[in-house]
A protein has these predicted regions:
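Glycine-rich FAD pyrophosphate-binding loop
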Residues: 1-24
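Residue-level detector of anion-binding/catalytic polar loops
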Residues: 4, 42, 105, 153
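Short beta-strand/turn micro-motifs composed of small residues
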Residues: 9, 59, 168
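Short, histidine-centered active-site or binding-site loop motifs used for metal coordination
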Residues: 12, 76, 204-206
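A short acidic, helix-capping loop that chelates divalent metal ions and anchors anionic groups
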Residues: 15-18, 78-81, 208-211
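N-terminal FAD cofactor-binding segment of flavoenzymes
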Residues: 19-62
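Conserved FAD-binding catalytic core of PHBH/FMO-like flavoproteins
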Residues: 36, 136-214
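Conserved N-terminal helical subregion
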Residues: 48-149, 156-162
Length: 214
């Protein structure tokens, strides 16, 4: 591309070993797979990803067998599956190791200041170093320091929900199916992982979440 790129992050990515486990998982759609393939990261992700070919959604007053449950199936499309469930650390490491990032300079520090001029920016790091650039991309989450330093506002609201996450071995096989039940306090999801495991994601009130973890 001819661009010089610096990636500023105070923490180096952690290389996962074969037994590594991350309670944070993502559902990667077929479109996400195409993006990660173009980024030359998918081949490193797919050995650790579990495809899901079906999805079943129902509410608290129903059961997954009833006709009012929603069902989505890859068999109804021209695709081999609906997507994959994979632990986040696998995606992060695969992207970090992508050949497309070999020309990127990694800077182990945190953002401390931003100044903008016409067509340029100056970045000050916590260790005192300064970087001059034409473009700053803030990809540092909902509490983005880059956004705050750039003076960009935001709007938001509280959902009064907390997610409890865990990996489980269930009494019955997951059958490459994502299961989601909507309860009065929030959705409960069982997402298929490798080795017969499922990822439990239970969104509920803070009080019930504390009770579940007690």
């Amino acid at each position: 591309s001819g661009l010089k790129v610096a990636l500023v992050d105070p923490a180096a990515p952690r290389k996962p070993d074969e037994s590594a486990m991350d309670l944070r998982v993502s559902a990667l759609s077929r479109a996400s797979e195409r993006i990660l393939t173009a980024a030359r990261a998918w081949d490193a992700i797919v050995p650790h990803a579990s495809p899901y070919c079906d999805m079943v959604v129902w509410d608290a007053a129903s059961t997954p067998e009833r006709p009012d449950a929603l069902r989505f199936s890859a068999a109804e499309t021209a695709e081999p599956n609906l997507g994959h469930i994979v632990e986040n650390l696998r995606v992060q490491w695969a992207l970090h190791e992508s050949p497309l990032l070999r020309g990127v300079t990694e800077v182990r520090s945190a953002l401390a200041g931003l100044e903008f001029d016409e067509g340029s920016a100056r970045v000050t790091l916590e260790d005192g170093r300064r970087l001059a650039c034409q473009l700053v991309i803030g990809a540092d989450g909902s509490q983005s320091v880059a956004r705050q330093l750039a003076g960009i506002g935001r709007s938001g609201w509280a959902y009064d929900q907390t997610a409890v996450v865990a990996h489980l071995h269930t009494g019955k096989p997951h059958r490459e199916t994502a299961w989601q039940r909507f309860l009065p306090n929030g959705p409960l999801a069982f997402l298929p992982l490798q080795d017969g495991r499922v990822s439990l994601v239970w969104s509920t009130t803070p009080d019930e979440a504390a009770s579940l973890q007690a």
